[in-house]
Amino acid sequence: MSILHDLAATIEARKGADPDSSWTAKLLAKGPEKCAEKFGEEAIEAIIEAVKGDRAKLVSEGADVLYHFLVMLAARDVALDDVLAELAHRQGQSGIAEKAARPKG
């Protein structure tokens, strides 16, 4: 997971950077809504490649999805470790039991 932590740290460092100096800084400067929109676009592109069955393009789009997910988290000040902790908490539970235990509403 080191690469994801490294990428998350780089994204976090770009928060205060000049938007003209970095794509990440430019995206973050546009706000969390734009970051979420871009994540959604990349997720759809990955879905399309998964349906097509193009492995190389799916790998590439998957990398874009991970990057934009981390940008979206950073835009809302959510740490990657918080998401990983939630995954760790769910590990070992059946998906059905985990979903049933979620708060309603």
Swiss-Prot record:
UniProt KW keywords: Amino-acid biosynthesis, ATP-binding, Cytoplasm, Histidine biosynthesis, Hydrolase, Nucleotide-binding
Reaction catalyzed: 1-(5-phospho-beta-D-ribosyl)-ATP + H2O = 1-(5-phospho-beta-D-ribosyl)-5'-AMP + diphosphate + H(+)
InterPro entries the UniProt entry points to: HisE, PRib-ATP_PPHydrolase-like
Cystine crosslinks: none
UniProt xrefs under Gene3D superfamilies: MazG-like
An MF annotation (GO) of this entry: phosphoribosyl-ATP diphosphatase activity
Enzyme nomenclature, EC number: 3.6.1.31
Single GO cellular component term: cytoplasm
One of the GO BP terms on file: L-histidine biosynthetic process
Enzyme's top EC category: hydrolase
Source organism superkingdom: Bacteria
Matches recorded under SUPFAM superfamilies: all-alpha NTP pyrophosphatases
Pathway, per record: Amino-acid biosynthesis; L-histidine biosynthesis; L-histidine from 5-phospho-alpha-D-ribose 1-diphosphate: step 2/9
Places the protein is found: Cytoplasm
Aminoacyl-tRNA synthetase recorded as keyword: no
Family membership noted in the UniProt record: Belongs to the PRA-PH family.
Protein name: Phosphoribosyl-ATP pyrophosphatase
Species per Swiss-Prot/TrEMBL record: Ruegeria pomeroyi (strain ATCC 700808 / DSM 15171 / DSS-3) (Silicibacter pomeroyi)
Gene that encodes it: hisE
